[in-house]
Amino acid sequence: MSIAAAQISPEALYDMLQLFDAQPWTKRLHEELAELWALCISRNQQLLLRELIKDFCMLDADKELNACKEFNTQIQDWKLNPTNTWVVAVANADEIDGSTAGLQKLKNKVHPHEEWHSRFISNIPSSAEKINNGDNVILFDDFIGTGKKMARKILWLKKLLLQRGVGDFKIFCACFTGMQFGIKHLIDESNRPVFASISLKRGISERYVGDELTNALSVMKEIEGQLGETYRNKKLVDYTLGFEQSETLYCAANDNCPNNVFPILWWSIRKNKRPFKTLLQRAG
């Protein structure tokens, strides 16, 4: 279906041309954009979505490569070396998630490769069998949202290691991208250094102020009112403005969308129970 076939208004067509220019990845999603604009019941809703999508951070190949390079630099700044340092994905045993995928991309970017390649571990249970007293551990996730998940993973790793009598080690945290408020929470909660190549502000609350903020939040909730109350056994009320109201505008290219993202971009059921073609995809 072409944009013209969608019979959208001239104003909506102008919005999309702006988005195609600002966010080239949206060009292949013109049908999804047309559906999203058609879902809106006011011009104010369309204008808010236009501005938010223009601010969206899509982690493409170039940004990802830069994040890997900056991670490598951060390791040097932390003065860590491969003889006693482990880089551990925060995944559970036998789980494939964003942390394991990101770790694989990091594996050949940390120098010197021949010394570091064996120091990457794909999940926390496996790492708990290898970490010893005096070691350094970099817990890695591709994205830090609220920071609470990483804080829980730190406690879990400590518990597993104590079962082996290992208690003298240092933990560092790292991600490709993180929400500023989540990174701050993690630092405050764990007192650990945290690296993020890209740090993001909340999409609405940390962009608008005063009456504009109040209006923007109200408009977004109006838009969310067009979505189904439940989806895959989840309740929309638990994800309004994104999980724990994170207001996230981020996804890695061709990857699973974090639940911290505004649900209007991934919640694929309308309130009339009909399917909705979303800009982003989320499994789980």
Where are these regions (language model features)?
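PRPP-dependent phosphoribosyltransferase catalytic core
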Residues: 2-86, 90-99, 155-284
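Short, glycine/charge-rich flexible loops or terminal/linker lids adjacent to PRPP-binding catalytic cores
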Residues: 95-135, 145-152
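Active-site flanking residues adjacent to catalytic metal/cofactor-binding acidic residues
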Residues: 141
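Structural motif
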Residues: 86, 136-138
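A short glycine-/small-residue-rich loop at the edge of a beta-strand within enzyme catalytic domains
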Residues: 144-145, 173
